[in-house]
């Protein structure tokens, strides 16, 4: 019979990190680099564990080139052809280190598996695979993880998405190294409206991280971050990686058409289960499906490097406030307080961007 879980589940908006005594003298003293050895692949990762989402408007080769300069990771979207992959590898031939900070994404069809084998065979330096479905609870998905693990025993596998501890354990035991956590939390996802299914992201990360770490596995919080503070909360809750879509949208390096409205530039950004994505990549929305994503216009934001600086600065600040000398220590130092209000919004409607400020005529 139907049941109700009465324990409250929390999202990033429901909490703040409590400040704690700190010996740090400057944000510059914080070490954001993490090192992991993965459970199944046995491979070592070194970098800053912020990951660009494998959406076709975010997980682009151009984004990967920019983020790798700061040791951030990119999961390349699955719609690039084999030829496009080879063109990219040839273009970065003088800087092959980029390949250590990117992963190839794949669906779970036989076609996807064949394409994955071909690309990984042509590019042996590519060591990360992201297996991505909206619903990570299906037996078909678990079987596909086992199939990929058998074919690629030394590759590191990201797999998801799920939101509960028992399924996190299932995916890890089936061959995944990093489980992606999040259903319905993305900025352009409408699964919670269309299907009524989901889980508040902070609680999902807390529970899945606990399950994963008990097996020496790892988790990646995917979705729900609206600002750098949310990224810090996800890491404080136990996420080893944080995947970002909306915060990285709208930049020069991103996909999505550029449009103009009222003299202002915007870029299209859409969910990968939206009408826009399905019509672009599959020709139409299948008659048995409903769109579970939306299409929006994001104000044009220029080069992605400024957003990266803002994210990393926010993380360093979170660490100094909580007394974490290294990002590794943040989850050990984190105490969350439940709140009814995040920020003072008195002048929110009057806020202007740096570019708007430059265009103002200052009265003398």
UniProtKB/Swiss-Prot annotation:
The keyword Oxidoreductase applies. Belongs to the IMPDH/GMPR family. GuaC type 1 subfamily. This is GMP reductase. It comes from the Eukaryota. Keywords: Metal-binding, NADP, Oxidoreductase, Potassium, Purine metabolism. It comes from Onchocerca volvulus. The keyword Hydrolase does not apply. InterPro entries: Aldolase_TIM (IPR013785), GMP_reductase (IPR050139), GMPR (IPR005993), IMP_DH/GMP_Rdtase_CS (IPR015875), IMP_DH_GMPRt (IPR001093). Homotetramer. NADP(+) binds at residues 26-27, 78, 132-134, 183-184, 272, 288-289, 317-320.
């Amino acid at each position: 019979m139907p049941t109700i879980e009465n324990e409250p589940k929390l999202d990033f908006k429901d909490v703040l990190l409590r400040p704690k005594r700190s010996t740090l003298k400057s944000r510059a003293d914080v070490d954001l680099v993490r090192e992991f050895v993965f459970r199944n692949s046995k491979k070592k990762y070194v970098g800053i564990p912020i990951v660009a989402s494998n959406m076709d408007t975010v997980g682009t080769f151009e984004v990967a080139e920019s983020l790798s300069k700061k040791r951030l990771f990119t999961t390349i979207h699955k719609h690039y052809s084999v030829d496009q992959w080879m063109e990219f590898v040839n273009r970065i031939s003088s800087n092959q280190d980029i390949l250590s900070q990117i992963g190839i994404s794949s669906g779970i069809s036989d076609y996807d598996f064949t394409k994955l084998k071909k690309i990984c065979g042509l590019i042996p330096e590519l060591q990360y695979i992201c297996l991505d479905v909206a619903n990570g609870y299906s037996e078909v998905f678990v079987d596909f993880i086992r199939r990929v693990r058998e074919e690629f025993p030394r590759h590191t596998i990201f797999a998801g998405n799920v939101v509960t501890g028992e399924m996190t354990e299932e995916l890890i035991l089936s061959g995944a190294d990093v489980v992606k956590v999040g259903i319905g939390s993305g900025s352009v996802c409408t699964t919670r409206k269309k299907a009524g299914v989901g889980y508040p992201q902070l609680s999902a990360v807390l529970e899945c991280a606990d399950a994963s770490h008990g097996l020496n596995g790892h988790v990646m919080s995917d979705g729900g971050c609206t600002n750098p503070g949310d990224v810090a909360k996800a890491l404080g809750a136990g996420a080893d990686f944080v995947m970002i879509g909306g915060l990285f949208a709208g930049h020069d390096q991103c996909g999505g058409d550029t449009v103009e409205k009222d003299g202002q530039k915007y870029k299209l950004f859409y969910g990968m289960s939206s009408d826009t994505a399905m019509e672009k990549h599959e020709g139409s929305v299948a008659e048995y499906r409903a769109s579970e994503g939306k299409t929006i216009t994001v104000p044009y934001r220029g080069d992605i490097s400024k957003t990266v600086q803002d994210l990393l600065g926010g993380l360093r600040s979170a660490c100094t406030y909580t007394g974490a000398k290294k990002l590794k220590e943040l989850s050990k130092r984190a105490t969350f307080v439940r709140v009814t209000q995040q920020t003072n919004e008195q002048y929110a409607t009057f806020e202007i961007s740096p570019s708007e400020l430059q265009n103002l005529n200052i009265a003398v």
